[in-house]
Amino acid sequence: MIAELRALEPTQLEDFTNSLVDQVVAAVTDKIPHLESSLAVAELTVALHYVLNTPEDVLVWDVGHQAYLHKALTGRMDELANMRKPGGISGFLSRAESSYDFFGAGHASTSISALTGVCLADQIAKRTRHRVAVIGDGSLTGGQSFEALNHLGTLGADVLVIINDNEGSIDPTVGALHNEQSYGTYMQSLGWHYTFLEQGNDVRALVDALQQVLAQPGPQTLHIKTKRPDLSPPKSYKPGTTFQWWAAETVAAIFESTSDIQILSPAMFAGSGFAPLRERYADRLIDTGINEAHTVTTAAGIAAAGGRPWVHIYSTFLQRAFDQIIHDIALQQLPVVFLVDRAGLVGSDGPTHHGVFDADFLMNIPGVTVWSPRNGNELQGMLLEVAARPVAGPLFIRYPKARTEGGTPTDFCTHEWLKKSDGSSLWVSTGALSDLMKNGVNHLHLAQNWPFFDGFGTILSDFEEIHVFEESTGLGGLAGAVKALMAELDHPGKCITHKLPLEFIEHGPRLQLLREHGFNTFL
């Protein structure tokens, strides 16, 4: 399809783009917000592949969620129907899929840094080619993009950064950069030439603009305005069916009875279920932009000033603030509550978004407490507990992107026997995995993963064989902590761990992935 595109006259590009859009819309039935983002840059996608000699020229898409037409143009049209499904292609960019996917992505604000690396490598190799990054105005709020602009602007390399400005990402864009004047002033202050194009959905205008800026030496920015179609109804959660619904409903009740709790989120309120509360509680639900590190240290500042900050953040994005958790919060023992959404396997978003690493790294930080509810009511009990009794240090409440039936309303308790009888074998599990499992002869659910509750070691001593189950990967976490405790107690028994493998797990339905990666016997 690329060869067909490049053989066209400029006057034929609009019809070609419209036909391509129709084919992609007919093929894609999943993740409609990402389809909307892809359609917003339909004309840009066609113009880029028309003007550039990809894959020899470098084209980097930030995040990659907007690359559905890019995939279609580069030989994957027939695979779009199975995108994000088991065995199908990724919903993001993947170097394993195509040479046209120069740099894999899934998280925001990385594209300009990647392009900086390309420029440095090309300097050493004395290689001349076009180098282009496409970044949305939402991703441009991320600190890494500013760091990269600052560095790349000093290299004097021939490079183009295209700012796709549709005034939103998952949530509406926040921050002081909000119009062509502020963008232009900022870019020029960092040594970048700046060009603005209002007609970002006009393929002919885009081709002309690209040809002009690519002919200019040095670092160039092309700021285009685009419009994203609205194809999906407002997101809602059926009452009582998901952890996100339980979190949002409980927070709404807490806000009714308290006035001092503030919740910060790095541009993820739309997926949290909290979005309907933002109009009523604008001063207490604070969108910080795609800035995980900044978000966490801001929460630390609120806590240091005597406030009560909570941070809503996806597990996969918590990784981006690891240093701030240690240096700014844990080291100072500041009372910050983290609502770690999407903990565990997340399904069709795949390896860039699975929340399978945080449990291991959190439990290695001094002074940290980690909770993992098994159902909606337990999550509710946890949130009500921390609202009623302020925490003494950092607390992380991990919950998955999953369905839950709720369970029996209860006050928070650190552990619960799901089944107890005779036998020398003990199952220890945590989180939503506890509710999925067929109960063993003795099955103990740990709502508090860490630190262990008083008396846990005594319970372990009553059993000869300990099975530990957790929906995470790596060598630490709950399983590592149980093994360490057994060694400390000189426990003579055997500890058998059931974890996800130490690998990047592909996309697919959560239950299917669990069954395929070691849990089939127990679910």
Spans of features found by a protein language model:
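Thiamine diphosphate
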Residues: 82-114, 124-128, 154-234, 245, ...
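Cofactor-/ligand-binding subdomain signature composed of acidic, glycine-rich
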Residues: 1-27, 186, 232-236
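Glycine-rich anion/phosphate-binding loops
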Residues: 317-324
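Cofactor-binding active-site loop characterized by glycine-rich and histidine/acidic residues
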Residues: 33-155, 261, 274-275
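Active-site cofactor/substrate anionic-group-binding motifs, chiefly glycine-
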Residues: 284-295, 309
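Short, glycine-rich nucleotide/cofactor-binding loops
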Residues: 136-141, 241-242, 291, 313-316
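Conserved glycine-bearing catalytic or ligand-binding loops at nucleotide- and phosphate-handling centers
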Residues: 372-390
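Proline/glycine-anchored alpha-helix kink/cap motifs
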Residues: 44-50, 115-123, 159-161, 251, ...
